[in-house]
Amino acid sequence: MPDKVTVTTRSSLQRPDSPLQKGPEISPSVLPQVLAVFEVGGQVAAIPIQNVERITPMARLARPPGLPAVLEGILNLAGTAVPVLRLDRLFQLGEQRLGLYSTLIVMQGVADGRIALLVDRVSQIVTVAHSEVLPVGKHNSFNECACGMTTVGEQVIHLLAPARILLATERKTLSEFQEMAQRRLKEWSIEKE
């Protein structure tokens, strides 16, 4: 049986009174990286936790007509339209079977707003020293999306650069879909007086 998945929000990861935010500045290159490790299409990958707003179980998605195949749908997250991207289709991996443990990783700062990645499951949150990350050559990854590799135990993990998951034209198209979905959400919402 898969491990239990906990819903985590960015605010629960950073406290304003945290001692890490005080004291002398430390070069980011010596700090360890905290990564959200996930499985998708038979592959294991990770993104920096600083790009993750929340990790949540699969939810009901709107599927407006005309969505590209790489979009599973639009998530209504507290009144905000969040496009849900299928990495298995984008990276041409084995087709992902959606199930009880399918998970959404909601990220900020990747497109012009939020975007969610639909993955098989998030398996763990790990801390990795920068010295344990092997770089991936610029020409070994489409759009330099895979920016490094590391191992945890015997498991090889591909590190993804969230800002490079989509090409600029794909981000523009995604932003247009997001704006359209946001307008539709507003049209159907009931104004509270």
Spell out what each predicted region is.
Residues 1-193:
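An acidic, low-aromatic, low-complexity terminal/linker signal
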